[in-house]
UniProtKB/Swiss-Prot annotation:
Organism annotation: Thermococcus kodakarensis (strain ATCC BAA-918 / JCM 12380 / KOD1) (Pyrococcus kodakaraensis (strain KOD1))
Protein name: Peptide chain release factor subunit 1
SMART domains linked: eRF1_1
Keyword check for Protein biosynthesis: yes
SUPFAM superfamilies: L30e-like, N-terminal domain of eukaryotic peptide chain release factor subunit 1, ERF1, Translational machinery components
UniProt gene name: prf1
GO MF annotations, alphabetized: sequence-specific mRNA binding; translation release factor activity, codon specific
Amino acid sequence: MSHKSAEMYELKKKVEELKSYRGRATELVSLYIPAGYDINKVMQQLREEYGTAQNIKSKSTRKNVLGALERAMQHLKLYKQTPENGLALFVGNVSEQEGVSDIKLWAIVPPEPLNVRLYRCDQTFVTEPLEEMLRVKDAYGLITVEKNEATIGLLRGKRIEVIDELTSNVPGKTRAGGQSARRYERIREQETHEFMKRIGEHANKAFLPLLEKGELRGIIIGGPGPTKEEFVEGDYLHHELRKKVIGVVDISYHGEYGLRELVEKASDILKDHEAVKERQLIQEFFKHLVKDTGMITYGEKEVRKALELGAVDKLLISEGYDKVRVRAKCNNCGWEELKTMSEGEFHVYKKQLTHCPKCGSQNITFEKWDVAEELIKMAEESGADVEIISLDTEEGQQFYKAFGGLGAILRYKIQ
């Protein structure tokens, strides 16, 4: 997986965190500086906003906005020029206790160039420009066709979406002979033609907007019999969409299962696509597990050890993995404890650990960081590949449920 994919994963987690905060008033500052924009002009704007904010009537809101702007200006002094892809700053009081100030700052250099210049002070952080970067833009159109039913879908990233399911009234074959049989066959052919037209209309409606936006990479069509070839060869799809047909595949199922089978059977056509690569990767992991080769490991403690030894070839992290590493330290006697837990468990742990278990002091501080980000950094330092496993595939769900969403394929066995 590319370094950019790991960056996108980290960006997604930061966006989710930013969206979880809500200010008590319009006091959360979002600042987007596009690539190539003069950072001195931004500083000048913030000074003007600082002057305006001094007129805010509410004392607590005024204090929080001024504090956020001061922190933002202080941070911008670290930059001689805007980073290559631009910069997004989010600053504000995120304390859940009224009257308590806890001004935090997030500085994000995005994995793609920012083209938005924005300053906003609101109750929530503005994350839409970053969310647009996270949106998977490339898509493949999927169509399964039978005589009496069809499914239209999309493969976008690793997710298969069902857009439309259609059924027809095409009658089955008859055993009658003579003119009755010929009349019956003409009716059947006409019904089939009308159904094909309807499939084409629905496919055009689904795929043409994507084609116009430059997001449609190709169309794959599947089905159990010759109907799929009749559909492809007939004048049913828009002529521009017909040019995008990159494969016609034999499949057995219809509906959502049919779309999944279509993607699986078209793996040669889609060999460079994320969903196919992910399936092959998880299959490789399971193969080592079944054969007990000793060339995989899973679980946070085991994966961390393998990374420290430089034994990891591919680090596998599920999108659903959400553990944090927490260090509790007594500033009186020096006692400390290091644990891995979920975000929810951390809030309980912090409330319960009010006194040092060694000396009884209440002077305890907590340090918290994201386990996935820490392990990704360790992997990159040791030259290991990082693979983010989605929850949009059956294999991805299985990896998350069975192994907690964290595993590794090794370079060599660990004794």
